[in-house]
Regions:
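Nucleotide-sugar donor-binding/catalytic module of glycosyltransferases
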Residues: 1-215, 220
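C-terminal subregions of glycosyltransferases and related glycan-biosynthesis enzymes
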Residues: 1, 15, 175, 180, ...
Length: 304
């Protein structure tokens, strides 16, 4: 399939068919055609793409794989086919006409890139603009400390230079594969470039697993704790394997904080108060995916 040095990866899964038209229009409208497009069909029928101006390939995934392992398939495809760049995208989102060209340009100098986000609703109407800038990530990222407590680097607005991927793997039990990927890159000295003038229109729907700045409830709290505990467990294992002592200490403390929170939340009265305090202060404390899951020490600064 390969015709270009850059691969754009999208995943087609049940539920995105109502939005895929916007996605493919944004692909066709890009101000460059110097990329290939790979669509991974996750146990769903192939989409009717219509006339495309770039090289397109589709892979049907019939096995029952986690979202993490499906992304891993895409990453391995890009590496095995000797692509230089891999740009991530979601079929329920779309992006500005310059996103791919600017990503390609900056990936000549940086290990990864991430562009700005506008939040949109199910009807593609803008809810909030320049969201990364507003939640304080309107700058380059070059340290794991910047995404230690939460993540702002998702698989709808990022791209990586594949030369920065060395001996990479994705744990099968990982939930937040994006958080894992960029944490590992940063632990290995990667530098990420913020592109403020390219936009991903990030759709907020009821089906969206995470979304941005959603009200916390019991189910989302349990999911967030599971995400963080799994993330920290796997990063600690990685740090041990690679003798990353400074990072290991930081992540061990974060894991301890999550375990302490998990224990405290067994008291249902406290759980209700915890959720109420988070939601009352969401505008102030929210700064990315999973940032609303606060350890007890941080939570008390809002509760008092």
């Amino acid at each position: 399939m390969k015709k270009s040095k850059t691969l754009v990866l999208g995943v087609n899964y049940k539920g995105v068919e109502n939005y895929a038209k916007d996605y493919f229009k944004s692909i066709v409208d890009q101000d460059t055609d110097q990329f290939d497009l790979l669509i991974l069909n996750d146990n769903t029928a192939s989409l009717k793409l219509g006339e495309m101006n770039v090289n397109v390939d589709e892979i049907m995934i019939s096995e029952d794989k986690s979202p993490a392992l499906i992304r891993y398939d895409g990453l391995n495809y890009a590496i095995s086919n000797n692509y230089q760049n891999l740009i991530f995208s979601d079929l329920d989102d779309f992006f500005s006409i310059n996103r791919i060209s600017l990503s390609i340009r900056e990936l000549e100098k940086y290990d990864f890139v991430f562009n700005e986000i506008h939040l949109i609703d199910q009807n593609s109407e803008i809810i909030d603009e320049n969201y990364l800038y507003k939640i304080c990530l309107g700058k380059n990222v070059n340290s794991f400390y910047q995404i230690l407590d939460y993540n702002c680097l998702g698989l709808t607005h990022t791209g990586i230079n594949l030369e920065s991927i060395k001996n990479f793997y994705i744990p099968e039990n990982i939930i937040a594969v994006d958080w894992w990927l960029f944490t590992i890159l940063l632990l290995n000295g990667a530098n990420g470039k913020y592109i403020d003038n390219a936009i991903t229109y990030y759709r907020q729907t009821d089906e969206n697993l995470v979304g941005m700045k959603k009200i916390l409830n019991e189910n989302r709290l349990k999911t967030g704790i599971r995400v963080k505990q799994t993330h920290y467990d796997n990063i600690i294992k990685y740090c041990n394997q690679n003798n990353l002592e400074i990072a290991l200490n930081s992540y061990a403390l974060k894991k301890d904080g999550i375990l302490e929170l998990k224990l405290a939340l067994k008291d249902l009265d406290f759980q209700k108060r915890y959720i109420d305090i988070i939601n009352s202060n969401l505008d102030d404390l929210y700064c990315g995916w999973w940032s609303e899951i606060l350890d007890l020490k941080t939570w008390r600064t809002y509760a008092n």
